[in-house]
Every structure is written in structure tokens, then in C-alpha cells.
Amino acid sequence: MASLREEIESRRTFAIISHPDAGKTTLTEKLLLYGGAIQTAGSVKGKQSAKHAVSDWMDIEKQRGISVTSSVLQFNYQGKCINILDTPGHQDFSEDTYRTLMAADCAVMVIDAAKGVEAQTIKLFKVCTLRHIPIFTFVNKMDREARDPFELMENIEEILGIKTYPMNWPISCGKDFKGVYDRSAKRVLAFSSDGRANGVKMVDEVEAELGDAALDELIGTVNHEKLAEDIELLDGAAEEFDLEAVQHGELSPVFFGSALTNFGVEPFLKEFLRLTPAPLPRKDAASGELVDPCSEQFSGFVFKIQANMNKNHRDRIAFLRICSGKFERGMEAFHLQEGKNIKLATGTSLMADDRAIVSEAYAGDIIGLFDPGIFSIGDTLCTGKKHVQFAGIPTFAPEHFARVTQVDTMKRKQFVKGMEQIAQEGAIQIFRDLGSGMEEVIVGVVGVLQLEVLEYRLKNEYNVDIRMQSLPYEHLRWILNDPDELDIKHLDLTSDTRAIEDMKGNPLLLFGSPWSINWAEQHNETLKLSEFGNLTF
């Protein structure tokens, strides 16, 4: 029977990030395929089939072929228990992605070989660098036309400001793609796929050494010569591999492959598991000390809440990242924010919308806790006499705003419940005019597609039709002043500025332009504004 330390050190918990359509969900499913968690991978946008991506569980995700919520996927591979946090790639869902990255110990960055680093990748990468977690790069779609690999490496280093080390090297691309050269093993893995096995089985990979005469026949003489030149150049000029730099997020190992055809996925997975750390210590915000993952004391934090994963039961699940110790079904833990002990009667493992009861889980694991309405994003749970509280994370200021009311006033109860539950998940933020109720609310979102998702979910999950009116505001700022030192109603503001409050009564200001923000700051000397709200945990 494995010890507590052995169980925890076998865990690997990472997030997969990318720009939309770079192949993130496809790579996720191929990792599951190699891990034996699934037998057939779904086609994310397949029109010929009724299959859908395993990690895309919400109806709207299956219809649109995009990920709009974060999924948690767990499987075992070669003695390691792997937790994948599959994050939304769509640019309108970056806030959920941000919180999910707080639960990861490292990240895999998927890049489209034809496009290089894109806008969404930059934003998510910056979140990773704030935490100094290891970042691995998978350059995808090498079986299609792609940019020069040297150009791609330079692109990553210049735009993201991180050094790179290619773990393998591509041999041509597109229709002429022949495979990759494994720099560590000093051998060629030849690309071999008939194109009909995509998503159904694992492809064979043919091995051959550089300089072997058989390589001329396998990849062609011209490709063989070009590969030899490239490797000589890399060995002489490229950054040296430094595992310590990797684990501090200063050097990104780069792998080339094709997730759709399964090529390069298993070699990537093996190297990734070899190089990535076991669960990392987390800082206790109260004491400033690091919490040892292998401590006997259980601790964890809620980083996500999802309502209606099972529409038949109108449930709410709190996603908990275990930071130390061991979870046992039926255990009691201290809920820091509530100030009392609660019984954790049931924990569930999470494979998108499929759930199974778990009797135990360890630091590094993500479990789902049934939430009767007591949990919020950022809550800390712990055991032991010394309570811990994990550091806070900011909330992004929304950039799009709309006034929302229900069409049928008789469905006010369902409307309020739906709005509050969806807001508690963190996909939207809801506000109201100072001192008003929930007759009409102001919804703020990071991207406009979230408004469409809100309308869809209220109709589909709560049977509520809504009216939505766009508001002419683009910026939101939290007011940091204490209520007794500032009278919000008497601030000197422009006509396109609006004073509102969030659902906890915290005051905020909506602005129509940056000029209006400057006016407010210049004409109200004591006013303190912030671009970020704060969730403390």
C-alpha cells in the first residue's frame, strides 16, 4: 500500500492553454486516449459524426464546437495520476481560465504551427508567469502547412519573453511532413498515418537514427540533409537544457507534433511527466509560510463552481484543488470563510460531466464537492489546529455591459436564482444601481459571447426568457475607499459615468471612456480606484 508521500508525489496537475482553434481540446483527448481513459476521441467540430469532445460537456459547447467552461479530466499513465485542467480556448472566457490556472502546477501551451503566438496565448501565458510555474510548449498541426521552426522559436521567445529548448525537431511540414528528430534519444520518429485512423487508434511511430542510410529512403535525401544541418545548428547555438530553469518557468521545452493524427503525443506525454514536478507547496497568506503538500493536515481551495452539471437535479458542484494531505469521504474540515466545521459527505471525481464517488483523494487532485450554497470561489477548507488561508486572486474587470430583465414577471424567482448561480460560477458578474434590488440587473462580461451563453443557459436550464439591452460603458473600476471616508453620491463625475454596486454591496464606477476615468481621478483627490476586484482565499 502506497504511503501518503508516494501517493502525492505520483500526482501531476496541469492546465492546457491556447488560442482558439490551436488544437487544445484535440490534444487533451489524445492524452486521454494514450492514458486509456477513452477508447475513441471525439471530433470537436465534426459534421459527419454525432461525436463530441469529451471535455466539452455543456450543450452549447457541443453545438458550437468551442469550450466555454473548464473541465477536469483524470487518468493514470505509467504510475502517475494525471489531472488535466482543460481550459476554455475561446477569448471570451479568459476569467474562468485565469482561475483554473491558479489550481495548476504547470501548463501546456498549444501553438498552431501556421500562426505562432496569438493574442489569447499571450494573455494566458502572462498569468502563468505571474505564478512562475513550468510552461511546456506543444507546436501543433505540423502535418499542415507551417511556419519555419526556427522562426516559430524566435516568435515564442520575442513575444512571450521566455527562453525555449526544442526537445524534438520537425522534418518538413504539411503534405511533406516526415516526422520529428528526438534530440535526447538522437533518433528519428517517422510520421506514419493513413489519415483514416484519426481519433480511433494510436498511430505507429517508426524509429531510425540520424545518419542511417535507411533514413534516405524513409524521409528522403533532401530532408535528411536539411535535418542534419538543422540539428548541427541547434546543438551549436540553441539554449542549453536546464531543468531548474524549466521548473521556475524560465525555460520552455518545445515539442512538435500533430494532435489530430496522434503523432508525437505519447513521446511528449512521457517527457512531460519526466520533467514536471509533483504538487507544489502553496503559500499560507496568513503566516507567509509554505504549506507542504505531503503534510498530514488536509487543505484545499475552491477555484470554480458549476451549477446544473446534472440538469435533472439542479445541482451545484464546487471544484476543490487539494493542496495538502488526504481527503477521505465523510471527513470534517474547517470552512475558513464560514468559520465552522463542515462534513464533506461526498467527493466526486470529474471527467467533464461524468462523475464518480471517490472515497479518497490526495494533494494535487481536483474533486467535486456538492454545494448547497455555502461555497464561493476562493474559499479555503482545512483540518488541524492551525488554520491556513491561501492567497487571493483578482477578478478581471468586465469590458461589456448589458441591462437584463426577465420577460415573464411571474418567473422572478427562477430569474434571480439563475442569475445568482451563473454569477457564482464566475462566468459573468452582476451589479445593480446603488440601493436597488434585483428587478433589473447590470451584467458585466469579459467577452460578448458570454452574454449569448447567459441567455442560452437561463432559457435552457431555468426556463426563463430575458430581455437584454446593451449599455454604453466600456470600463469598470472598484472603489477602494472605506465607506466612511467617501460619499459616492457626491462625487464629481462625467455624464457617462455611473455608480453601481456588486451583490455584496461593494461600490464601483462604470465609465464610458478612459477620459472619464481620468476626470474622476483628477476631480476627486481622495478617490481610490482599482482595475481588479479581489477574491481572498
Question: Where do the PLM segments sit?
Answer:
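Structural and coupling elements of P-loop NTPases
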Residues: 1-537
